[in-house]
C-alpha cells in the first residue's frame, strides 16, 4: 500500500475562531457538524478523547499497536496514524472527512479520535456504551505545547506572541474551548458513565509500561508482558519522532521549521516559557476555575 499523498492539501489562510454552541471552534471542526452529530458509534468503538496537545497521538499509537500491531504490521509502515485513528470532527479541504474515514475504517474495534468537549460528543457513543480513553495533561505544559502547535499549523488560528496566547488560554479562547471545562467535563462524566478510562500524560511519561498495562486492563486485553514491553519501547518519544507514520511530517499544513509536531515530550517545559508574573496570574486563574473539581494534576515528577 502506498503512503497517501496529501501534498495537494493547501489552506489559503488561517481560520477565524468562531463561537459554536458556546465553545470556541474553527470551521474545520464544525463544517461537517450534521454528520458528526449523527455519527453512528458501535459498542466496540474506542473513543480517544483529549484536549489538543495532551498526548492523543501517543495513546492512539499505543492502541493501534495493541490491537493491530501483530495482526496487520503493514499498517505501521503504510498509513499515517491520523488515517488509522480517524479524527472524527476533522473537515479539511484535501483530506478525507473524519466521519468518512471512521465509517470506512476496516478494523474492529475502531479507534476514533476526538477533541470535542464532552457535551459535544455524538450521543451514539454514550448510547452504545462505547469505551472512552481520556488523556489529560497539566494545564501549563498543555498551554505551551498548544502555543507551539498553533505557530506551526496553518490550520489553526494565529496564536500571537506567547503572552497573548497565554491570556487567550486562561480565557478559554482556544479551539475546543477552555482547558478547564474540558478536563473537568470528562472527569464529571466518569462519575456516571463507567466506561471511561481517565489517564494523565504525566503518568505516561513517568512509567509508560505501567500505563500500557492499565490500558490493557481497561480494554480487557490479555496482552503478554513481553508484548507490552515491546510496545512500550516502540512508543517512546524519540522512536515516534523518527517515525514518519507517527510524527505528522506527511501533512503539508504543518511547518516543522517553525516547530516540530513531536516537539519535546517533557513534563515541566512550562518553566522555560512562563515568567514569574505569568505563573502567578495563571495560578490565580487556575485556583478559581478548578475550585469545584476533585481532579488532581501532578506537575512535579
Ligand atoms: N511518545 C511520546 N512521549 C512523550 N510525549 C509525546 C509522545 N508522543 C507525543 N508526545 C507529545 O504530545 C504532544 C502532542 O499532543 P497530541 O498528540 O495530543 O497533539 S494533537 O492534539 O493530536 O495535535 C507533543 O507535546 P510537546 O512536545 O510538549 O509539544 C508531543 O511531543
Curated annotation (Swiss-Prot):
| Binding of 3'-phosphoadenylyl sulfate, residues | 53-58, 137, 145, 201, 235-240, 263-265
Q: EC number(s) in its UniProt entry? A: 2.8.2.-
Q: Which SUPFAM superfamilies match?
A: P-loop containing nucleoside triphosphate hydrolases (SSF52540)
User: Cytoplasm among the record's keywords?
Assistant: yes
Q: In which tissues is it expressed?
A: Expressed in liver.
Question: What is annotated as the active site?
Answer: 115
Q: GO terms for molecular function, please?
A: aryl sulfotransferase activity; estrone sulfotransferase activity; sulfotransferase activity
Subcellular location as annotated: Cytoplasm
Explain the regulation of its activity.
Inhibited by Co(2+), Zn(2+), Cd(2+) and Pb(2+) ions. Inactivated by Hg(2+) and Cu(2+) ions.
Write out the GO cellular component annotations: cytoplasm
Q: Which GO terms describe its biological process?
A: catecholamine metabolic process; estrogen metabolic process; sulfation; xenobiotic metabolic process
**Which keywords belong to this entry?**
Catecholamine metabolism, Cytoplasm, Lipid metabolism, Steroid metabolism, Transferase
Top EC class per UniProt? transferase
The keyword Lipid metabolism is assigned to this record: yes
Q: How does activity depend on pH?
A: Optimum pH is 4.75 and 10.5. These two pH optima may correspond to two distinct conformational states of the enzyme.
Annotated function = Sulfotransferase that utilizes 3'-phospho-5'-adenylyl sulfate (PAPS) as sulfonate donor to catalyze the sulfate conjugation of a variety of xenobiotic and endogenous compounds, including 2-naphthol, hydroxychlorobiphenyls, T3 (triiodo-L-thyronine), T4 (thyroxine), estrone and DOPA.
Q: Which family does it belong to?
A: Belongs to the sulfotransferase 1 family.
For this entry, the protein name equals Cytosolic sulfotransferase 2
Kindly list the organism's lineage: Eukaryota, Metazoa, Chordata, Craniata, Vertebrata
**Which gene is annotated as encoding this protein in its UniProt record?**
sult1st2
Amino acid at each position: 500500500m502506498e503512503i497517501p499523498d496529501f501534498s495537494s492539501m493547501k489552506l489559503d489562510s488561517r481560520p477565524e475562531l468562531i463561537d459554536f454552541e458556546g465553545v470556541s471552534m474553527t470551521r474545520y471542526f464544525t463544517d461537517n457538524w450534521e454528520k458528526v452529530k449523527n455519527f453512528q458509534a458501535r459498542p466496540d468503538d474506542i473513543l480517544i478523547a483529549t484536549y489538543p496537545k495532551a498526548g492523543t497521538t501517543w495513546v492512539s499509537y499505543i492502541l493501534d499497536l495493541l490491537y493491530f500491531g501483530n495482526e496487520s504490521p503493514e499498517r505501521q509502515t503504510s498509513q499515517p496514524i491520523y488515517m488509522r485513528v480517524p479524527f472524527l470532527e476533522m473537515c479539511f479541504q484535501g483530506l478525507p472527512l473524519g466521519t468518512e474515514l471512521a465509517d470506512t475504517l476496516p478494523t474492529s474495534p475502531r479507534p476514533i479520535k476526538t477533541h470535542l468537549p464532552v457535551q459535544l460528543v455524538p450521543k451514539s457513543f454514550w448510547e452504545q456504551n462505547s469505551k472512552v480513553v481520556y488523556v489529560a495533561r497539566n494545564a501549563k505544559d498543555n498551554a505551551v505545547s498548544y502555543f507551539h502547535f498553533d505557530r506551526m499549523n496553518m490550520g489553526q488560528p494565529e496564536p500571537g506572541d506567547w503572552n497573548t496566547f497565554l491570556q487567550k488560554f486562561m480565557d478559554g479562547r482556544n479551539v475546543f474551548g477552555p482547558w478547564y471545562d474540558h478536563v473537568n467535563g470528562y472527569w464529571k462524566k466518569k462519575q456516571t458513565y463507567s466506561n471511561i478510562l481517565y489517564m494523565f500524560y504525566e503518568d505516561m511519561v513517568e512509567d509508560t509500561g505501567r500505563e500500557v498495562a492499565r490500558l490493557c486492563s481497561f480494554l480487557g486485553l490479555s496482552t503478554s508482558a513481553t508484548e507490552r514491553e515491546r510496545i512500550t519501547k516502540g512508543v517512546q518519544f524519540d522512536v515516534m519522532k523518527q517515525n514518519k507514520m507517527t510524527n505528522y511530517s506527511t501533512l503539508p499544513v504543518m511547518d516543522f521549521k517553525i516547530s516540530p509536531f513531536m516537539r519535546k515530550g517533557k513534563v515541566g517545559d512550562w518553566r522555560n516559557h512562563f515568567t514569574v508574573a505569568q505563573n502567578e496570574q495563571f495560578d490565580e486563574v487556575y485556583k478559581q476555575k478548578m475550585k469545584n473539581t476533585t481532579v488532581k494534576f501532578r506537575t512535579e515528577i
